[in-house]
């Protein structure tokens, strides 16, 4: 709701020209719309229930034309013959933002894990094989589910969706251009 208001205010002051979507707006949208919860398991070997609780999107700060996605979550890991272990995971990813003209949506493609930390450290070794599944799951989710969508029920955003010609990634924001 707040991101729509901020974008509407931005559109009201600039009806023709570039419109910026900030990393704060992307972060808010991703946290509201792109919840990630997954269960993994191999019978007799392990079971894990993983939830990503919060993500933060940074745009063009570490690498040009790339987004950084910082995520925090929690998990429950169950191994045969051992009590279940609750823990936390912090994972950082790099992704390539893509603007889809027809949908008026921003997607995050080519997810790459750059670092992660598991607590308690005692389960790091058991959890390490699951990190690949985490990356694949998040990559699949965010390549299919937008990180941000223009609200076509709002007439200014509908106009913007119909007139965006290109986008560029700048430090801290995505700029949507309506020029030729």
Residue ranges and their predicted role:
Residues 11-180:
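Extracellular/lumenal and peripheral-membrane lipid-interaction modules
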């Amino acid at each position: 709701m707040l991101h729509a208001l901020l974008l509407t205010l931005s559109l009201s002051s600039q009806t023709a020209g570039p419109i910026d979507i900030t990393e704060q707006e992307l972060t808010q949208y991703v946290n509201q719309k792109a919840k990630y919860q997954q269960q993994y398991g191999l019978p007799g070997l392990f079971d894990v229930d993983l939830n990503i609780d919060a993500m933060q999107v940074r745009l063009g700060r570490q690498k040009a034309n790339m987004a950084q996605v910082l995520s925090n979550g929690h998990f429950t890991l169950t191994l045969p013959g051992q009590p279940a272990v609750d823990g936390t995971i912090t994972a950082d990813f790099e992704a390539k933002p893509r603007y889809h003209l027809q949908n008026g949506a921003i997607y995050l493609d080519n997810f790459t894990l750059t670092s992660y930390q598991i607590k308690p450290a005692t389960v790091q070794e058991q959890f390490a094989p699951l990190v690949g599944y985490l990356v694949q799951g998040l990559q699949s989710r965010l390549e299919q589910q937008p990180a941000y969508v223009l609200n076509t029920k709002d007439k200014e955003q509908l106009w913007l969706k119909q007139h965006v010609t290109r986008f560029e990634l700048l430090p801290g924001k995505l700029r949507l251009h309506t020029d030729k």
